[in-house]
From Swiss-Prot:
Pfam families: TAL_FSA (PF00923). CDD domains: Transaldolase_FSA. GO terms for biological process: fructose metabolic process. This is Fructose-6-phosphate aldolase. GO terms for cellular component: cytoplasm. The lineage of its organism: Bacteria, Pseudomonadati, Pseudomonadota, Gammaproteobacteria, Enterobacterales. It catalyses: beta-D-fructose 6-phosphate = dihydroxyacetone + D-glyceraldehyde 3-phosphate. The gene is fsa.
Amino acid sequence: MELYLDTANVAEVERLARIFPIAGVTTNPSIVAASKESIWDVLPRLQNAIGEEGTLFAQTMSRDAKGMVEEAKRLNNAIPGIVVKIPVTAEGLAAINLLKKEGIVTLGTAVYSASQGLLAALAGAKYVAPYVNRVDAQGGDGIRMVQELQTLLEHHAPDSMVLAASFKTPRQALDCLLAGCQAITLPLDVAQQMLNTPAVESAIERFEQDWKNAFGNLNL
């Protein structure tokens, strides 16, 4: 599977890369804006943090296919091999199709339905990113949507994969993996929730106390 961090915080990427076997970093316009850095400054720093083997994702801003393609080429020139995120609108689908012919790898983003995700895959997107928690917030069932999308891609677009996004809890991420997703991207707070395990800390403290009571120190 492929595990990504959804952030533009270079320091946190460097810290968590020591702990998680991350495949790379995903960003979006809101994440980059929150960093207060120019995208052209932060992307090289993120690439350096994840190494040459890591995959970096960045999103276009244009609303029309021509503009999306031009921005995608600019991103690819700046960071060779970057995966360009394209919103799955009508214009976005046209852009994905054109970029496929140009050899630029894309991710169909802002996916709120299985049918929308399937269209992105059929247009040529390597990755499709369903927004799990945002679907839930609108009264839908994000996990069920991911399950449906995963099945559709397996049957009709096997060269594409679900990269599930928009999580508020580790449980949502695990449910996507159980549905067969081969890739997920975690916000920093959800990644940290996976590491914060009070019961484990309590068990370790008990081990240490028992050892110290018996041997007077914490050395092997």
